[in-house]
Amino acid sequence: MIQQKVLFISLVAVALGLGLGLGLKESVEPQVSCRYRCNETFSKMASGCSCDDKCTERQACCQDYEDTCVLPTQSWSCSKLRCSEKRMANVLCSCSEDCLEKKDCCTDYKSICKGETSWLKDQCASSSAAQCPSGFEQSPLILFSMDGFRAGYLETWDSLMPNINKLKTCGTHAKYMRAVYPTKTFVNHYTIVTGLYPESHGIIDNNIYDVTLNLNFSLSAPTMTNPAWWGGQPIWHTVTYQGLKAATYFWPGSEVKINGSYPTIYKVYNKSIPFEARVTEVLKWLDLPKAERPDFVTLYIEEPDTTGHKFGPVSGEIIMALQMADRTLGMLMEGLKQRNLHNCVNLILLADHGMEQISCNRLEYMTDYFDKVDFFMYEGPAPRIRSKNVPKDFYTFDSEGIVRNLTCQKPKQYFKAYLAKDLPKRLHYVNNIRIDKVNLMVDQQWMAVRNKNYNRCNGGTHGYDNEFKSMQAIFLAHGPGFKGKNEVTSFENIEVYNLMCDLLKLKPAPNNGTHGSLNHLLKNPFYNPSPAKEQTSPLSCPFGPVPSPDVSGCKCSSITDLGKVNERLNLNNQAKTESEAHNLPYGRPQVLQNHSKYCLLHQAKYISAYSQDVLMPLWSSYTINKSPPTSVPPSASDCLRLDVRIPAAQSQTCSNYQPDLTITPGFLYPPNFGSSNFEQYDALITSNLVPMFKGFTRLWNYFHGTLLPKYARERNGLNVISGPIFDYNYDGHFDSYDTIKEYVNDTKIPIPTHFFVVLTSCENQINTPLNCPGSLKVLSFILPHRPDNSESCADTSPDNLWVEERIQTHTARVRDVELLTGLNFYSGLKQPLPETLQLKTFLPIFVNPVN
């Protein structure tokens, strides 16, 4: 036994000796790193630093504890330190080896940990086809809104936003996208997803009163989710109604049970959710099995709008907000690339409106105009006024009196007051009971408020006229459906709904957009528009003798040979063809009104379509060169005669215009454009007459006598088409003859509510309108026909100080003119129809920048 113990001790001694001799020792080195140790259980027996969640309290954490164990719970990015990290339950995203399998990698995992090229550093995609992984038969569409992203930000600070700049470079972008009026958040977001103007979808502002509901709408009121406020069909319903799936990560209207349903997936708005969490959730939706995966997704972030409101659009803070928005886009694109979806998904990045600088030194107070402000006012950059006692006094409120008291009261006012019916037609802001009758159009950087208690006047705001440059929004698009490296002209956001439907191969619901007008953004347009079909062909108005007896009351003592003068109206076929080539170079305006009775009247210098329903031309068309004649015409009272081609019963008479009336005869084709007396006599006929308010003729005559020759010189000639508009019910569409009779029952000759003018020239001004092989350029106006010029405070002002500004205020799209007249322009153009639609939806901008 003793021998055994001695042997055991000897063996231990030998073993220890060998161990010491060979340098072997027990693994008891103190721990110095948290790598693979985060959230381990604390042990008093362990040597070295700790990595449990209480180590900071004991001041025993390893030096890399914050970077290794804390930062992953706060960061949405990988780092070299995090690569191959041990899986932790509470991280925002993972950089572990199994994260791809678990589908919870940080979006930059492959570029940071696997050495792959990031999306930002990739070359622009060169393939013309979608490159989608298995299971994606159709490209998903993501609609991403960055609230308040003014188009000018991208012009000024593009180098500070590398991700957005790459999207712009590689995809399709517009210099800007035009918001609808008022340029507010809910208004424009809902327009984008319905294709409807606010007057059509009902969200006419962020704050609304509806007398029929007797309810108020605001962004914070519980009534906001009442479906009665929300009209139209938002894109997420169009998607689901046609068998696809839609998911919305915030969008105005998406959490409302519109038409009885919600999007397939939706989130209740919560502004505290980080942008990165929103992107991560969107990416998870794209990871879903095919049967659950959405085909359409919205994503919304509040920046740079929130910062713009607080600090204004020109500030260091706005740059930081833009960089945050840029990083959010970068995170989305990296996440798409990690899923091999970056060249599969179609992405539209846009904004709802821009942002403008404001100051408490630039306020207009209603107390300066009224002894007592006894009404309710929606204050700010897009003010409206109504009765404060509603619903009782809603309909009896003296809106006209309010407008009078706010018109031409100071030498310099920073707003103009309008009845809604007199607002520029381009705004499409009248045809809804929720739009109050009194509206103030406020100058840039100014606001109109009740009194001096108003204090929300520093920083930035929006809501102004949508023609102001500061209100312009961004539009960028990227993906296999869009052309690459493509810049397009500006367009209005009502067109985006149709565009999205085309990308998803859906049939759009009725909307205010012009379907096909954005085909030039797409590689392979899904929808090919068809030409409008004329509903009514012209009748014949043959040349005939002067009626006897002549009861027209017209006279012209300067005509010595009436037969010879009238014979000039009897053009043969060759002369008619020559007249059409000169006066209708882009085809005859087609009449889309049903049961309209009219005939074409050819003269050498102009052609008109005379309506036997309203006893005046529907339109008159002529072409003037860069140096039109400016001889003084005979006055209408001295020289007018019946058009012998029009039966007396279907003609205006001079006796319709009595000196004591406010209405006077005006001409569509100016007689003074004739280069000889005979050519002027061709225009001094009753078929060229339109009834005009005497006050309006000041504008009309200055426009034709001064501005039209000026524009002709600048554009190397013009084709001019003008005519009356009848919109008595203010719905933005032409009134039928029966509707006109409802409003005008005391005369056979109705008074137009507006007049339109469409000026067309060659884009390349080397060429004339008659010889234009390339693109056309258009300038069109819809001029309210009002009895006075109080809109311009022009009673004592020379015409040159106000007329041009007035007509520029009332610029319009050709498409607006078409809707209000029932006419179809440019029917003779040989170019593809989508190019013509671009021309028709173009809106010129005249607003001068703020000094």
Swiss-Prot record:
Show where the SMB domain sits: 30-73, 74-118
Where, per UniProt, does this protein localize?
Answer: Secreted
Catalytic reaction equation(s): ADP + H2O = AMP + phosphate + H(+)
What is stated about pH in the biophysicochemical properties?
A: Optimum pH is 8.5-9.0.
Q: What does this protein's record comment on cofactor binding?
A: Binds 2 divalent metal cations per subunit.
Which residues does the annotation flag as glycosylated? N39, N216, N259, N270, N405, N512, N594, N745
Which residues does a divalent metal cation 1 bind?
D305, H309, H462
Temperature behavior, per UniProt? Optimum temperature is 60 degrees Celsius.
Q: Does the keyword Secreted apply?
A: yes
Query: Mind telling me which residues the site (Cleavage) is annotated on?
Result: K421, D422
Binding annotation for AMP:
K271, H309
Name-wise, this protein is Venom phosphodiesterase
